[in-house]
């Protein structure tokens, strides 16, 4: 009996060590978080430096959109870097926290956000609130984000999580500038504010991702939000033409939004249906008929075609005019006289 008790105590001790073992940087994906402080960023160089994800400061409800938000989002996405956004909080009431969440949603809607939307709660305002008041802010923000179809996460520094954010149940992004993070089970860890990355002038925050969100935020396949559709491959946004089975799709070259309707890619004009798949043959568009080559998908111009029993004259703009009846109405040509052979 004593031996069994001793064994159980040893097992419990080992388990406790494992549970609270500091998180090492080499165990996860490495990324950065950036804002206007970094100025203009060369995202191609950032990608070449091995950065695997980026959190972009959206700004705050109080001060508005970060001056470099759109440039950073477009630059990161164009270089195949998965992105998330974070909002700096000044809220002191749940109503203000809800407005901060709505602000985050409003700036995220035009981009394929591949990471949780982060609530940065660390301001001096929050140090004046009780733990319960801060948790209420977090819950309001995160619930609003979740209700809009996004995944939330809470960012703060280790001591604030241990001080005035106790009881927060949401995923956590913990700032602790040390060789390891000893806060239990962080989803992300901000390990330094003095990192150096190619493409960025000066210091930048270095982050590590530990939680796999692929079961929550799909890493592969079509993703639709706010009426826009993207195609992701391991969180990287596909751009340009994509063939899936017997269907072809076109995603615009910068942000990778799936295109519908008429599309010009520099080589020709194509037509994509409501599902984004390329359509061919004779198609009615806004009351006019156009013909798209079944082999290439490109729109034909300045030619004549026969579809079934009908003949169409196609002008330089691609508009097809049915000339079948017109041709039938033409008088028959007189028979040519037969010239006897000499």
What are these regions (language model features)?
Residues 217-342:
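Extracellular adhesion/carbohydrate-binding repeat motifs centered on closely spaced tryptophans
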Residues 28-38, 44, 48, 167-219:
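Functionally critical loop-and-helix segments that line ligand-binding/catalytic clefts
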Residues 36-38, 60, 87-89, 123, ...:
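A mature extracytoplasmic/lumenal domain signature
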Residues 28-142, 146-149:
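Substrate-binding cleft of extracellular glycoside hydrolase catalytic domains
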Residues 148-162:
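Aromatic-lined carbohydrate-recognition surfaces of secreted/lumenal glycan-active proteins
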Residues 96, 160-168:
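Glycine-rich, charge-decorated loop segments at or immediately adjacent to ligand/cofactor-binding or catalytic sites
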